[in-house]
């Protein structure tokens, strides 16, 4: 229980928890956890209004930029939420890449609902783990760890968000969906959750002093062995069109639809029973002094820019707030050279800097929210 004390104490400063005593005089974990989750829900309007800045911009801690492609409305959106969950050492970042007729609405809906849902689930599971240190969430005999808490929180959140999206009265997600690539930084640890084919890349300093790119996520494409096996096992099909060699897509068993170029996504209920899932891959990394920054970007960037090129572009940008925009601009130029004749995709980038510059720190930017619509 000791290794959870600092986390729980931090929450206690932000959320008033009345611990209920049972007949034995012990704290009832379930009631305390339920109350914590209830408190979070009550604060939803506060979290969306006063104390948070809704702007299209960047600062010395994070840089955001999004550019519409040549296929119509920009279906990408992004979010950086500093002071996530009223915790000074936490930040939430996300890239959401929509697709289909309602893709831009789906992406915004997931962006708007995921952070708060994640926060509620995290608080509830954290309270249970703190008050019941032997709690076993994954069928093992091990005590639950911080990573287990975040993983279970993400799994519950993604399942809930996808279910709510399916029953949304104003958004038709049957043939539309979105990816979701998110990061939570908590102190000196980052937790990465990925649904879809957006990508997170870390810039790490090598022993020789140069920056090297470390890919933190998998691009969940239908031709990945484990993804293809699942899809075929659910009677879905995976193949490329004649005019798109190398672009594997997911198809219904008896129809030439929907042709989805990813194996995980929110929405797209026309193909969910045939192997598409919204289950995130969740990983963690302990931040070292050699870890400089993380780039989150939609697939439009990675179609024309390599991981190494991306970190070199960002690291060579003199001013941090301009880093995301410069990377997008370089990707636009690369697209025109490498993919001439193809309509340019939407391009969105979040750059999260892991160490403060002389004029920036997490505490100085506490409670700022940056949104790109």
Curated annotation (Swiss-Prot):
Keywords: Hydrolase, Magnesium, Manganese, Metal-binding, Protein phosphatase. Pfam families: PP2C. One of its GO terms (cellular component) is plasma membrane. GO terms for molecular function: metal ion binding; protein serine/threonine phosphatase activity. SMART domains: PP2Cc. Binds 2 magnesium or manganese ions per subunit. Mn(2+) 2 binds at residues 97, 299, 345. Its cofactor is Mg(2+); Mn(2+). The keyword Metal-binding applies. Its EC number is 3.1.3.16. CDD domains: PP2Cc. Mn(2+) 1 binds at residues 97-98. Residues 61-354 form the PPM-type phosphatase domain. The keyword Ribonucleoprotein does not apply. It catalyses: O-phospho-L-seryl-[protein] + H2O = L-seryl-[protein] + phosphate; O-phospho-L-threonyl-[protein] + H2O = L-threonyl-[protein] + phosphate. GO terms for biological process: drought recovery; microtubule cytoskeleton organization; negative regulation of growth; protein dephosphorylation. Belongs to the PP2C family. This is Probable protein phosphatase 2C 73. It comes from Arabidopsis thaliana. The lineage of its organism: Eukaryota, Viridiplantae, Streptophyta, Embryophyta, Tracheophyta.
């Amino acid at each position: 229980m000791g290794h959870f004390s600092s986390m729980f104490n931090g929450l206690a400063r932000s959320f008033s928890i009345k611990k209920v005593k049972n007949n034995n005089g012990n704290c009832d974990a379930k009631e305390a956890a339920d109350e914590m989750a209830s408190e979070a829900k009550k604060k939803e309007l506060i979290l969306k209004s006063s104390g948070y800045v809704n702007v299209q911009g960047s600062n010395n801690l994070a840089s955001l930029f999004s550019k519409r492609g040549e296929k119509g409305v920009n279906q990408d959106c992004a979010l950086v939420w500093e002071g996530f969950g009223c915790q000074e050492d936490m930040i939430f970042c996300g890239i959401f890449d929509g697709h289909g007729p309602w893709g831009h609405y789906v992406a915004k809906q997931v962006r708007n609902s995921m952070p708060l849902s994640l926060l509620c689930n995290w608080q509830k599971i954290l309270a249970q783990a703190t008050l019941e240190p032997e709690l076993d969430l994954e069928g093992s005999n091990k005590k639950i760890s911080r990573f287990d808490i975040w993983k279970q929180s993400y799994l519950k959140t993604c399942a809930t968000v996808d279910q709510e999206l399916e029953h949304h009265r104003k958004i038709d997600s049957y043939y539309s969906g979105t990816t979701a690539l998110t990061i939570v930084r908590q102190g000196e640890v980052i937790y990465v959750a990925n649904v879809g084919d957006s990508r997170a890349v870390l810039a790490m300093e090598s022993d020789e002093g140069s920056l090297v790119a470390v890919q933190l996520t998998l691009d969940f494409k239908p031709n990945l062995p484990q993804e293809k096996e699942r899809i075929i096992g659910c009677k879905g099909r995976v193949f490329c069109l004649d005019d798109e060699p190398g672009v594997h897509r997911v198809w219904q068993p008896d129809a030439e639809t929907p042709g989805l170029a990813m194996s995980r996504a929110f929405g797209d209920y026309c193909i969910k029973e045939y192997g598409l899932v919204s289950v995130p891959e969740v990983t963690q990394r302990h931040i070292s002094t050699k870890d400089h920054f993380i780039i989150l970007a939609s697939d439009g960037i990675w179609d024309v820019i390599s991981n190494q090129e991306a970190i070199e572009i960002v690291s060579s940008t003199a001013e941090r707030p301009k880093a995301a925009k410069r990377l997008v601009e370089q990707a636009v130029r690369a697209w025109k050279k490498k993919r001439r004749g193809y309509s340019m995709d939407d391009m969105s980038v979040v750059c999260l800097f892991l160490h403060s510059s002389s004029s920036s720190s997490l505490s100085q930017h506490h409670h700022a929210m940056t949104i790109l619509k």
